[in-house]
A protein has these predicted regions:
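A generic structural signal for well-ordered alpha-helical segments
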Residues: 31, 75, 99-100, 124, ...
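Short, basic, glycine/proline-bearing loop/turn elements
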Residues: 28-29, 101-107, 135-138
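Catalytic core of membrane glycerolipid acyltransferases/transacylases, capturing the structured
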Residues: 48-111
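Generic preference for hydrophobic
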Residues: 40, 55, 82-83, 190-192
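Helix-to-loop junction immediately C-terminal to a conserved catalytic motif
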Residues: 28-59
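A conditional alpha-helix N-cap/helix-loop micro-motif detector
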Residues: 36, 110-114, 145
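Non-catalytic C-terminal accessory region of glycerolipid acyltransferases
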Residues: 1-23, 115-246
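Structural motif corresponding to alpha-helix initiation and N-cap regions
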Residues: 40-43, 92, 115-118
Length: 246
């Protein structure tokens, strides 16, 4: 079905949102907290955030999406949707149904037809649905941050929604590329930065460079409140002020 014709009802449905909430509360969150030792810091940075936004984490493990949906505050992920690789998660009906249930997902093609995926993502954002995007496009094989594509920043600018940077640490060690199961009781950290907006006249690539810089600083300084070498906030003065007043 063409993205332009696909209805958005299921992404906005209150009953489906409540069903996902129950699944996460009684299944996926207990499972993740049993398998992993997790710490989430920075909720104060996004307190009061409403409407659509784009969650942008680094990506180093198959655990990353489950950690975002299961470990971040419920109110932040209640309506969160994400694209899932069509060639991996949508080949079989059972797997696609579970993926949609757990992650409120929609299929994206990893090769070709990227415009259709961006079109669907933009439609959801305009409808008020927050989106999870991994701009690296694939998991890091070394655990180091890879090249972030600027598509999420372009959407943020065109739709007028903020990017919320998420720094994830420990996922690669818990379940690196090639592993079938995570290492039990591995320690993971999720640092939530404050919402970031493009500056006046700032292009998508420059904006994404600032987002990546903020994520790297959160990882290096092990805090959701990192500082640049000159003592300024990497999130921008306005973003930092919003976080302090929330």
């Amino acid at each position: 079905m063409d993205d332009e014709l696909e209805p958005l009802d299921r992404y906005l449905d209150d009953r489906k949102a409540k069903r996902r909430k129950r699944v996460r509360k009684f299944l996926t969150r207990p499972a993740m907290t049993t398998v992993l030792r997790s710490t989430v810091l920075g909720e104060e940075n996004v307190r009061g955030l409403e409407g659509a936004f784009i969650l942008v984490p680094n990506h180093s493990s198959h655990l990353d999406a489950p950690m975002v949906f299961s470990l971040l505050p419920e109110w932040l992920t209640e309506r969160l949707a994400t694209g899932a690789a069509a060639d991996y998660f949508y080949r079989k009906r059972g797997i696609s149904s579970l993926t949609s249930l757990f992650f409120n997902s929609y299929p994206i093609e990893r090769k070709g037809e990227r415009g259709r995926a961006a079109g669907m993502t933009g439609r959801l954002l305009r409808a008020g649905v927050p989106i999870l995007v991994f701009p690296e496009g694939t998991r890091s094989r070394t655990g180091e941050i890879g090249q972030f594509k600027s598509g999420a920043a372009a959407l943020s600018i065109s739709v007028g929604v903020p990017i919320v940077p998420i720094a994830m640490s420990g996922g690669h060690e818990a379940m690196p590329v090639g592993a079938s199961f995570p290492k039990l009781r591995s320690e993971v950290f999720l640092f939530i930065g404050p919402p970031m907006h493009a500056r006046e006249g700032e292009g998508a690539e420059a904006f994404m460079e600032r987002v990546v810089h903020a994520i790297k600083l959160m990882l290096e300084q092990r805090t959701p409140h990192p500082l640049n070498a000159d003592g300024s906030s990497p999130f921008g003065e306005e973003d930092d002020a919003e976080a302090r007043s929330a």
